[in-house]
Amino acid sequence: MKIKSIVAICAVLAMSLVSFKPSDKEVQSEKPFGGLALYTVRDAMKDARTTLEKVAQAGYVNVESAGYNNGKFYNLSPADFKALLDEMKLTPISAHQGTANFDNIDQQIADLKTAGFKYFVIPVPPMGLFTFDQVNKRMAMKGGAKNLAEILDKLGEKCAAAGLQLLYHNHDFEFRKDETGVVPIEYLLENCNPKYVNFQMDLYWVTKAGADPVDYFKRYPGRFKIWHVKDMDDQGRFAPVGNGKIDFKRILDNKKLSGMQYYFVEQDACFNETPLEAIVISHKGLEKIGFK
């Protein structure tokens, strides 16, 4: 082959490589977005550094803690936990604080602020009000919705004074009438002061209760600042986002009405994959649905 021919072929190949670039859609799909509730990977968080690295690699940018104990997040001081998140380019948004009460609320608020969180989330009725029937695997609450509302308002007022926002996270039992005929979630929405208390809607548990998230958005617009996005399989079990039957597109179309500022993938239990595999599947599902 002549030298000129070889040069010509090389030139064509070079031009082909230069002209090739991924489409805008492909670039966008690689851009990190969305949040993960670390409860999903709670066991793996024993090795916080490695696990958070994998969370970031899966494409998430925001995180929600569910591992506060004795003044530490996942056995790290609030400052050290914040430093680790910064290193991984992950942003702390919300923290589930299941042990909050009137005696420790000030310390917990201080720790959340040091770690960089914005939202203080009450995951279940606090201060001994939550009950769980081990035999029937059924969650419930005692003490009544009025009592819970008063507690949340007091805790929320403390949070607001410190620059945090308090949210209450639902399960399914709040959507069932109690022994007095009251639907607890509706009582809370109608009686808690929105200056101090708003809500984190868990889309799976609302669906599990037989309720419609969009109906609640319409009835109580602007009150649902964070969503938990988790799917439901045909057996009613938890599933990676996009692998179940919940119509997230319809719900997402009503994002503005709901007041949603952030959302987090959460999967309480995994059945066909490990939690670290599930969060990758869910992130791809988010993108297909239209979350960003």
PLM features per residue range, with description:
Residues 64, 94, 121, 167, ...:
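Conserved beta-strand positions in the central sheet of alpha/beta enzyme cores
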Residues 11-19:
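Hydrophobic h-region of N-terminal signal peptides that target proteins for export
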